């Protein structure tokens, strides 16, 4: 493994294997926009506004790694280490040393999202399929702990960008050199050309080998005024019926205590999210993972 990661790791440095409490209680902390950022391996300051001349020429050193990504039990055993800890992570391909760099507010949830292909990078997923999960290592370059989940998104993406810029962009699965939310984002010319090159291989296109149904083709071929639904609106009853059919949880979802007692019931995860004042994405994460929310509740589908 050391030979495979040689281009990323300073061999004179110590890659620390962290115990459950080590992540929280040790290390050198530097506050960046309310983030507690820890850089154990190289003890360096990292700022989003000022570069560190002493470390800018050195590749980042992982402070924690996980192998056996194809072993679900191995992933579950890392939960205590990764849960409620965020920062900068990477998936490194041990065959060619290409990697994907990302940021997360919860390493455990984000790792599982990638492994289950939920909101993951397309190029990274193709590499998982081509090489196998056993040829990848999950690495943490920098982390922070927090008591509240309300964390500056910009500070985190700025930190991610600083790490992306430390590597040759051609060796990254990332499509963007600047980490941002995709909302309202316009790709740089460099990123656009990288995506064009990626999709030259038809196998990389999400619709390659797939066909639309006759019904879908009929609707596509009738845009605008030719479409039978043009200018029409669904009735409230029809909308309710369509919503019910699309609902993943036909009996609704509920908030349960830690003893599995139902506290409140909702028609869907959107209603639950509105009640707690959180996003439906957050609710979905906890519904799918079965993890405890706010150390008090679990979100679960209502069963018969």
Swiss-Prot record:
Segments traversing the membrane: none
GO molecular-function terms, A-Z: DNA binding; endonuclease activity
EC number, as in UniProt: 3.1.-.-
GO CC annotations on file: mitochondrion
This protein's record includes keyword Membrane: no
Domain GIY-YIG residue range list: 84-175
Classification via SUPFAM superfamilies: DNA-binding domain of intron-encoded endonucleases, GIY-YIG endonuclease
Keyword Nucleus recorded: no
Entry similarity comment: To endonucleases of group I introns of fungi and phage.
Note: Encoded within intron 1 of ndh-1.
Protein name (Swiss-Prot/TrEMBL): Probable intron-encoded endonuclease 1
Organism the protein comes from: Neurospora crassa (strain ATCC 24698 / 74-OR23-1A / CBS 708.71 / DSM 1257 / FGSC 987)
């Amino acid at each position: 493994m050391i030979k495979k990661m040689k281009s990323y790791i300073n061999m004179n440095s110590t890659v620390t294997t962290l115990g459950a409490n080590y992540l929280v209680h040790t290390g050198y902390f530097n506050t960046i926009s309310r983030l507690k950022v820890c850089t154990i391996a190289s003890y360096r300051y990292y700022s989003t506004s000022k570069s560190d001349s002493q470390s800018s020429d050195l590749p980042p050193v992982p402070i924690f790694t996980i192998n056996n990504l194809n072993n679900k039990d191995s992933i579950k055993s890392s939960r205590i280490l990764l849960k409620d800890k965020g920062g900068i992570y990477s998936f490194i391909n041990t065959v060619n040393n290409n990697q994907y760099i990302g940021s997360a507010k919860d390493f455990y949830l984000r790792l599982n999202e990638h492994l289950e292909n939920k909101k993951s990078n397309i190029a990274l997923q193709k590499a998982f399929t081509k090489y196998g999960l056993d040829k990848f290592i999950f690495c943490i370059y920098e982390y922070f702990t927090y008591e509240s989940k309300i964390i500056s998104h910009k500070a985190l993406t700025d930190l991610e960008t600083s790490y992306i810029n430390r590597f040759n962009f051609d060796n990254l699965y990332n499509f963007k050199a600047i980490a941002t939310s995709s909302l309202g984002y316009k790709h740089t010319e460099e990123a656009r050309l990288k995506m064009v090159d990626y999709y030259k291989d038809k196998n990389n296109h999400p619709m390659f080998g797939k066909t639309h149904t006759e019904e879908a083709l009929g609707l596509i071929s009738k845009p605008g005024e030719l479409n039978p639904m043009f200018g029409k609106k669904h009735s409230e009853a029809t909308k309710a019926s369509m919503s019910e059919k699309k609902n993943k949880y036909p009996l609704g979802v509920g908030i349960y205590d830690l003893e599995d007692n139902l506290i409140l019931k909702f028609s869907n995860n959107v209603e639950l999210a509105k009640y707690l004042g959180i996003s439906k994405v957050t609710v979905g994460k906890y519904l799918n993972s079965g993890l405890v929310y706010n150390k008090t509740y679990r979100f679960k589908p209502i069963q018969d």
